[in-house]
Each structure stands twice: as structure tokens, then as C-alpha cells.
Amino acid sequence: MVVIVDTISNPLRPRHPEKVNRPDSASPPKPDWIRVRAPNTRGYADTRNIVRANGLHTVCEEAGCPNIGECWDKKHATFMIMGDTCTRACAFCNVKTGLPNALDADEPQNVAEAVAKLGLAHVVITSVDRDDLADGGAEHFAQTIRAIRAACPSTTIEILTPDFLRKEGALEVVVAARPDVFNHNLETVPSRYLTVRPGARYFHSIRLLQRVKELDASIFTKSGIMVGLGEERHEVQQVMDDLRSADVDFLTIGQYLQPTRKHHAVMRYVPPDEFSSYEKVAYTKGFLMVSASPLTRSSHHAGEDFARLKAARAAHAR
């Protein structure tokens, strides 16, 4: 069977076989405000070497993040645990789909060692969806959090989780490990779920974020969406309201970028001034923090944003 090949990784490997028979989806040319420089700095190379030496995966590489050069130059990386293969096939995502391998029992400790080597004050841990596991990987998340706490007590920990759909008790396991920030992305507006995120349920994700606050109100909650997928402005504003009803603290909004022609097309490149408008509206709805720009991604500037988030909570409490 013909497969889409990841031409970045070495050796080349099959990727997105489920998308092979889809027709190509053409996107408009990228505007100037989207373009970024290719990564080639010493800091970038050092970060890559540490990731490789510890046998780890990062969402920076797997998802083709446009900010990888900037972040890795500063030795900031978002570690992706539980392998590099996802059990879902979202139309926007560049992470490969298939049957994942068994969990690596050494991974939590390997991640903790990499965090120590990079000297991270704030680390972001995400994962693929693991619908094949009874708990969706919740205990592995918890073990990773605990390993980082033991190795780097002063490092703050942000997690970006899957939705643990139909995994009873999984969320409670993760929250009990007490990450500093719990992020779960809605990704898009409800009307686009069928074509963009068919394996997920919008209101399940809203409820998951709300439940985190019910379990531990001290944990910051965060969520993000992409724009440029065919949504309307009023739908984005409704997402803001839904997230605030779940007491979510931090909202990110970024431009969707098409990984390959087999993925969902970019319907529109949203101009920077429209992102600024979204940010202003979101603040009026009560979010402690909002980041909205074409290149905003969940983990971009996460450390700096965490410091600002704490300051905003303290100011709000006064």
C-alpha cells in the first residue's frame, strides 16, 4: 500500500496511511506573517541531541511546529510521551496514526533526566491518544509528573492531555499527581468537529476541563483552538463562553497550518489584527491569560506565560 512518508525523519517512515486515499486539499499560499526561519542554531542542535540521547519524542517535531527553531534554540521542548503513534486520525494533525507500541517503563525517568539536562524551569508534557490502553495512559502521565518532581523539584510542570474518552477514573489519576497547569485543547469550534476532530466530543472536552477544577481548584486550566478551518467569528466567541463556564484560566488561539495536502485545507489565513481582536474579547470574558496570534501554539512561551498566569491570579485575588 502506498503511504505518506515523513521526509523529515531519518530513516524515512510511513505516516498517515489512513489519509492516502483522500483527495488532495489545496490551501492558499502562506502570507508573509506566517513565514519563519529554518532552525540552524547551536542551541537547537544541543536540544535535539539531548532529546535523541534520551530516546524521547517531542510534539515539536512530530506535529511539525513552526516555532521549533525559536523554542529549541532556548532549550525549550515539549516532550511527547507514550510513543509517536496515535490511535486517532484527526484531519489537522501531523502525528502519525496506527497501532502503538507498548509503553516504555523507563520513559518517565528518561523524561525527568532530559528536563534536568536542559535545566528547564518549566516543562510541558503531552502525549498521543492511547485509546488502546485501559486508562488511556493516565498512570503513565502521573508517573512522568512524579519522576520530574523527584529529579527537578523546582521545575513547574504543564501537561497537555488527550480527552480520556470513555476511560473512567483516568482524569482523577492525572489530577492527583498535581501538575501546575492542566491543558486540554478543544482544537476547533463544535460545528467543525465532524470533519476536523471526528474521534472527539466537544462537550466531553469542556466537561473534562471543568472536572479538573472540581478536583483541584489550585491547578491552572488551559485550552486552545485553531482558526482558519472554516469557523465563524461568533462560534469562536461561543467557545470562549463555554470555556469560561468551565472556569478555564488560559486560552490560546493560533492559525491552523496544513501539514500535507492530505490533511484538512486551510480555509483562510486570519490576519494579525483579527487575532488581536479575539484576544481583547477573550479578556473581557474573564480569562486570566490569553495568547492569540498566527503562530501561537499551546506550548509556545509556556514558561513565561506561566509566570504571567500566576501573577494574574494573585492580582485577581487582591
Curated annotation (Swiss-Prot):
InterPro entries: Aldolase_TIM, Elp3/MiaA/NifB-like_rSAM, Lipoyl_synth, rSAM. SMART domains: Elp3. Its EC number is 2.8.1.8. One of its GO terms (cellular component) is cytoplasm. [4Fe-4S] cluster 2 binds at residues 86, 90, 93. Residues 6-32 are annotated as: Disordered. Binds 2 [4Fe-4S] clusters per subunit. One cluster is coordinated with 3 cysteines and an exchangeable S-adenosyl-L-methionine. The keyword Iron-sulfur applies. Its cofactor is [4Fe-4S] cluster. Residues 72-288 form the Radical SAM core domain. Pfam families: Radical_SAM. One of its GO terms (molecular function) is metal ion binding. [4Fe-4S] cluster 1 binds at residues 60, 65, 71, 299. Pathway: Protein modification; protein lipoylation via endogenous pathway; protein N(6)-(lipoyl)lysine from octanoyl-[acyl-carrier-protein]: step 2/2. PANTHER family: LIPOYL SYNTHASE (PTHR10949), LIPOYL SYNTHASE, MITOCHONDRIAL (PTHR10949:SF0). Belongs to the radical SAM superfamily. Lipoyl synthase family. This is Lipoyl synthase 1. It comes from Bradyrhizobium diazoefficiens (strain JCM 10833 / BCRC 13528 / IAM 13628 / NBRC 14792 / USDA 110). The gene is lipA1.
